[in-house]
């Protein structure tokens, strides 16, 4: 699988397509290219493989197929800058996905991924429960390091009481 052979409908893994792993509404709106290079494409594939593990584990736990919706995975440098992302964001390199899961709250999704880690089923660099003060968290950030040690950080991103700036708290804070 190479960048030259990719079409929007190309399956990166069984349940995740090139389109959904490189989708960017901001990029489309601003006319920015959001195409990964070969190394980034390799990272996207590895990230999608971990998402498949999460999907399968959730299916077993809940006794039904559980779809994972990818809100954001890869971001080119231009797209990452346009959304105000950190220059070192794992999204920039295809090593993170902002996700939610059908029929499961984002808090429960985060707890389930932590349980998978505790059971030795998956590893991660960062798991971030994003913005729970909005009622239901907007998403769960699942970040990976494919070529170095992972920190297994569990964080909550919030704008509570910080003048509207995002702050990161260790642990899950519903």
Task: Annotate each predicted stretch with a short phrase.
Residues 62-72, 124-130:
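Surface-exposed patches in mature extracellular/periplasmic domains of secreted proteins
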Residues 101-174:
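Catalytic cores and adjacent binding grooves of peptidoglycan-active enzymes
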Residues 75-79, 104-106:
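Short, charged/polar surface micro-motifs in flexible loops or helix N-caps
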Residues 40-43, 98-102:
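Short secondary-structure transition/capping motifs
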Residues 63-65, 92-96:
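Short connector loops at helix/strand junctions that flank enzyme active sites
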Residues 78-94:
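Charged, often glycine-rich, active-site loop that binds/positions anionic groups
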Residues 2-67:
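Active-site acidic/histidine clusters and adjacent loop/turn architecture
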């Amino acid at each position: 699988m190479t960048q030259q052979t990719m079409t929007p409908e190309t399956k990166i893994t069984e349940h995740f397509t090139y389109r959904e792993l490189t989708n960017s509404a901001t990029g489309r709106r601003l006319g920015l290219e959001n195409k990964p290079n070969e190394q980034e494409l390799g990272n996207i594939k590895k990230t999608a493989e971990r998402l498949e593990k999460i999907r399968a584990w959730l299916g077993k736990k809940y006794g039904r197929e559980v779809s994972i919706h990818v809100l954001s995975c890869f971001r080119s440098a231009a797209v990452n800058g346009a959304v105000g992302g950190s220059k070192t964001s794992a999204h920039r390199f295809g090593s993170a996905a902002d996700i939610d899961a059908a029929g499961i709250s984002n808090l429960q999704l985060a707890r389930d991924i932590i349980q998978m880690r505790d059971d030795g089923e998956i590893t991660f660099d960062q798991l971030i429960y994003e913005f729970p003060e909005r009622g239901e968290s907007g998403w769960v950030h699942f970040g990976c390091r494919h070529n170095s040690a992972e920190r297994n950080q569990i964080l909550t991103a919030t704008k509570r009481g910080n003048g509207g700036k995002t702050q990161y708290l260790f642990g899950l804070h519903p």
